[in-house]
């Protein structure tokens, strides 16, 4: 057998752990936030329409190396939006530079066939803890940046 081919369009894709390097933004009302855009070329319109993108971040509040879903982080003070080819992260409670961030892209075809994930809505998947997602999708939990 030859070498394994590249991941196809129906494969789960996950990023390496990305150390955040946020930029201070100050609006006309003198309110500040910290932002970062991450290129994610595998986020296509099809993924946005029928798949799901999940985001996880190192929990800096407890300093124990735990990983949390971004929707649970900061009580709504962290906003992550997904557009074709890019993820935009905005922190309203401080600079998260240095925290490790990872995204997981799950195509709609995987959502329909994965025995663990089948039946979950997109909203339910966004609240599934990191350990469950990595186990269901066979993703390594080792925190490396390469």
Q: What would you call each of these model-derived segments?
A:
Residues 59, 93, 105-109:
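A mature extracytoplasmic/lumenal domain signature
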Residues 49-51, 99:
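Residues that flank catalytic or metal-binding motifs in active/ligand-binding sites
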Residues 98-146:
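C-terminal partner/receptor-binding element of secreted or periplasmic proteins
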Residues 1-20:
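Collagen/collagen-like triple-helix sequence repeat recognition
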Residues 52-83:
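Extracellular C-terminal loop/segment signatures of secreted glycoproteins
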Residues 21-49, 91-94:
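Surface-exposed ligand/attachment interfaces on beta-rich extracellular proteins
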Residues 77-99:
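Structured beta-strand segments within beta-sheet-rich domains
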Residues 17-19, 31, 45, 62-70:
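Tryptophan-centered short beta-strand motifs
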């Amino acid at each position: 057998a030859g070498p394994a081919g590249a991941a196809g369009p129906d494969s789960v894709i996950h990023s390496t752990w990305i150390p955040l390097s946020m930029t201070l933004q100050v609006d006309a009302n003198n309110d500040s936030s910290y932002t970062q855009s991450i290129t994610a070329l595998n986020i296509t319109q099809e993924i946005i329409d029928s798949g799901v993108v999940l985001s996880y971040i190192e929990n800096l509040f407890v300093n124990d190396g735990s990983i949390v879903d971004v929707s649970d982080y900061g009580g709504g003070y962290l906003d992550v939006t997904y557009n074709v080819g890019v993820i935009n992260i905005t922190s309203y409670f401080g600079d998260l530079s240095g925290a490790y961030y990872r995204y997981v892209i799950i195509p709609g075809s995987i959502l329909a066939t994965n025995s663990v994930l089948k039946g979950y809505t997109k909203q339910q998947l966004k609240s599934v803890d990191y350990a469950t997602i990595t186990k269901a999708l066979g993703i390594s939990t080792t925190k490396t940046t390469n």
